[in-house]
């Protein structure tokens, strides 16, 4: 009797099939078609699952709100593109946060974005500005700008301007020249990348500040900088500093035919004529500047300073009234007039500006302080103290923010009234303020110097120099004060450092040379060597 025929039996959902040979022996057959299909389905499921996890990870953990699921599906082959896209989105959100005054979140997002997209120069510029002006870390800002040139910064106008302005402002002349040597071609013609001219102008300016006039003129001619107002003015400054004052003025005057509406040319001509004490020419160009730009208060402010210098009081009053009449709604213009009054002791003008600020709801703190300073400038220390006490009684909201400057003015007035005990208290109060900037310290020291209070000025400048040893203005003023006081302890080292800075002030060098030769400074460190070096510089 024959056994019934054994049939196939599917196993594992049909992935395997149990079959039988002719003699009835079973064996396993792999259903490769179905296995392949299942593997494909599993791989697809795993791929989609992983893409889903990555999507959630980047969206919710890495804060990438515009992540695309399609990019997650192809992440292994699109990772570089995804990384840059993610960085750009963080930078976009960071810029929005900064615009909304959310600086902490903005800085965080910008930093995250630049890690992933270092070539996003808009984000780099914004973050560098926050470091320089907000966090007072100009060293980090400069390093970022230098790195930015390696990310095609040479082809980005906004980046080049921001980077080179910051480096010029912070006297990074060596770094600017290095960038120029790396990126500037040997020849330049019209139609070439205009950013090359921006770099050339920065390099020419750095060379000028370092006293390398030949190199400055090489940049000006090679990169056609003398076809722009900035280049013409720089060329004129080179001629002026070489002693060719007539040539410098001629360069500017001849350029007025090409640039008849250039406010910068008129302003520079007015400055040059003031320096050579040609009042009529200085006044003419200041008035022409005013005619060319009637809506600009700056030419009128220049005229006010000019007439004040030559003691023409009627014209000072006339143009001051013109500012008040035509620009009373312009807070900056009124504050410029208040600053003039503060520096020249025009108490009536300062008082009027203060009252106008009250009426117009301007930033009252600045105007109040200029009125205090106006009293001090004319040595009306009683008036300064009286007005200060009135402010203390009123205790306005702005006073807390302006307290350091307010304390410095009270110190000045107290010393002026021969109350050094109070003066010392207020001065220490001023110096103990942690937020105070180098610029503020220098400005306050200048006020003490102007009132012949050299010991107090020296104390402020010494404090400022300790915290900002590379600030040339602080160093200049500290040397001047030490020369006045006959302070020899650190004077030698300070003068040596001054000689290594940008275009040291020739008048200061001459004063130092004359004074160091006297017996009062016989114990100055390296005195003879410094005198020889100063003598050589002054003979050139």
Describe every region a protein language model picked out.
Residues 2-83, 191-195, 205, 209-224, ...:
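Long, contiguous interaction/recruitment modules in multidomain scaffold/adaptor proteins
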Residues 58-60, 84-99, 110-114, 123-540:
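Alpha-solenoid helical repeat scaffolds
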Residues 103:
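Calcium-binding loop positions in Ca2+-binding modules
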Residues 1-2, 351:
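Primarily low-complexity, compositionally biased regions used by nucleic-acid-associated proteins
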């Amino acid at each position: 009797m024959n056994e019934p025929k054994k049939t196939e039996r599917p196993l594992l959902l049909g992935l395997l099939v149990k079959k039988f040979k002719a003699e009835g022996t079973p064996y396993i057959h792999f259903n490769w078609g179905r296995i392949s299909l299942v593997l494909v389905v599993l791989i697809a499921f795993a791929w989609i699952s992983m893409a889903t996890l990555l999507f959630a990870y980047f969206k919710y953990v890495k804060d990438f709100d515009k992540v695309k699921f399609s990019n997650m599906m192809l992440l292994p082959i699109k990772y570089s593109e995804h990384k840059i896209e993610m960085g750009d989105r963080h930078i976009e959100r960071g810029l929005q946060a900064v615009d909304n005054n959310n600086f902490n979140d903005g800085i965080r997002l910008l930093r995250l974005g630049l890690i992933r997209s270092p070539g996003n120069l808009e984000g780099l510029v914004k973050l560098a500005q926050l470091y320089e002006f907000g966090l007072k870390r100009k060293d980090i800002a400069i390093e970022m700008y230098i790195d930015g040139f390696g990310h095609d910064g040479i082809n980005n106008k906004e980046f080049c301007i921001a980077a080179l302005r910051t480096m010029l402002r912070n006297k990074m002349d060596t770094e600017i020249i290095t960038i120029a040597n790396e990126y500037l071609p040997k020849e330049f013609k019209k139609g070439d990348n205009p950013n090359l001219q921006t770099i050339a102008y920065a390099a020419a300016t750095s060379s000028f500040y370092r006293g390398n006039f030949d190199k400055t003129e090489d940049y000006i001619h090679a990169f056609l900088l003398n076809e722009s107002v900035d280049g013409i003015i720089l060329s004129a400054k080179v001629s002026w500093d070489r002693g060719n004052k007539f040539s410098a003025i001629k360069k500017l005057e001849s350029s007025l035919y090409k640039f008849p509406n250039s406010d910068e040319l008129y302003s520079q001509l007015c400055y040059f004529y003031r320096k050579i004490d040609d009042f009529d020419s200085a006044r003419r160009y200041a008035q022409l500047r005013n005619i060319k730009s009637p809506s600009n208060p700056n030419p009128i402010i220049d005229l006010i300073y000019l007439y004040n210098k030559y003691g023409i009081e009627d014209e000072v009053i006339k143009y001051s009234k013109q500012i008040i009449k035509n620009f009373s709604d312009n807070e900056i213009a009124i504050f410029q007039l208040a600053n003039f009054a503060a520096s020249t002791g025009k108490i009536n003008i300062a008082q009027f500006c203060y009252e106008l600020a009250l009426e117009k709801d301007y930033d009252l703190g600045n105007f109040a302080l200029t009125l205090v300073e106006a009293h001090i400038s004319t040595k009306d220390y009683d008036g300064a103290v009286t007005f200060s006490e009135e402010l203390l009684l009123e205790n306005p909201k702005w006073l807390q923010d302006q307290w350091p400057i307010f304390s410095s003015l009270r110190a000045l007035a107290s010393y002026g009234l021969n109350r050094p005990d109070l003066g010392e208290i207020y001065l220490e109060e001023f110096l103990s303020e942690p937020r105070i900037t180098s610029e503020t310290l220098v400005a306050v020291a200048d006020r003490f110097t102007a009132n012949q209070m050299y010991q107090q000025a020296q104390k402020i400048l010494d404090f400022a120099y300790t915290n900002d040893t590379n600030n040339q203005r602080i160093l200049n003023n500290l040397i001047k004060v030490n020369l006045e006081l006959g302070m020899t302890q650190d004077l030698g080292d300070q003068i040596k450092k001054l000689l290594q800075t940008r275009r040291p002030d020739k008048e200061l060098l001459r004063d130092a040379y004359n004074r160091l030769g006297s017996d009062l400074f016989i114990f100055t460190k390296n005195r003879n060597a410094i005198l020889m070096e100063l003598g050589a510089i002054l003979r050139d």
